[in-house]
Curated annotation (Swiss-Prot):
Its main location: secreted. Belongs to the noggin family. It comes from Mus musculus. Disruption phenotype: Defects in Nog are the cause of a recessive lethal phenotype at birth. Multiple defects include a failure of neural tube closure, broad club-shaped limbs, loss of caudal vertebrae, a shortened body axis, and retention of a small vestigial tail. One of its GO terms (biological process) is specification of segmental identity, mandibular segment. Disulfide bonds join C155-C192, C178-C228, C184-C230, C207-C215. It is found in: Secreted. GO terms for cellular component: extracellular region; extracellular space; presynapse. Residues 77-99 are annotated as: Disordered. Homodimer. Interacts with GDF5; inhibits chondrocyte differentiation. This is Noggin. Expressed in condensing cartilage and immature chondrocytes. Keywords: Chondrogenesis, Developmental protein, Differentiation, Disulfide bond, Glycoprotein, Secreted, Signal.
Amino acid sequence: MERCPSLGVTLYALVVVLGLRAAPAGGQHYLHIRPAPSDNLPLVDLIEHPDPIFDPKEKDLNETLLRSLLGGHYDPGFMATSPPEDRPGGGGGPAGGAEDLAELDQLLRQRPSGAMPSEIKGLEFSEGLAQGKKQRLSKKLRRKLQMWLWSQTFCPVLYAWNDLGSRFWPRYVKVGSCFSKRSCSVPEGMVCKPSKSVHLTVLRWRCQRRGGQRCGWIPIQYPIISECKCSC
C-alpha cells in the first residue's frame, strides 16, 4: 500500500527544493431517515422519500411557531427561512463554470489566520553552505518563506448555502466544504479534506404510519464541516 508522506516529510522536501534553487431502493424506511450526529467524514447527503404526501402543508409552516420550537438553536449566521441573497443562482444551482469561479473567489479571499503551525514556524531555511556552516536567512525573508508555505498548505472551509427542502426548517443552511481542486502539499500529492464537523439543530418534518399517518416537527442534529486539513 502506498503511504502518504507526513507533513514533516513534505516540509523537508520543500526545504531541499528551496535550498537547491537558492544554491547555485424504496420503502417505508424512508419515513424514519434523518441526519444523525456523527464524526464520520465526509458527510453524506440526505435521502428523502419523493412522495409529496409526506411534505408539510402550508398550515404546518407557521414561522412564529417553528421559531418558538427551535428556540435558542436558531443561528441567523448559518440558517435562513428564504433564499439568501448571496446564494449562487438564487433558487436553482449555478452553472458549473460560475460555481467554480465563485468557489475560487471565496478561496482567494481567505488567508491563513490564527497561530502558524509549529511545523512551519520551526523551519530553518538555509541559503547554502559556506565553509561548512549554514547561514541563516534574514528574519524578514524567513518570514516571507514561512507565510508562502503556510498559504500553500492552508485548507480553509468554504461555505455555501444549501437548500434542504420543505421538510426541514429553517430550509436553508450554510454548509462547509474543502477546496480539493489543487494539491496542498509540496511536492504535490496531498489535498484538503474534512477533518472536523459541528452540528446545527434544525427541525425536520417526520411522518409515521403507526395507527394512521401522523406527522410533526422534531429537532434533529444536522452536521456541517467545520475544519479542513491537508492529508492523503
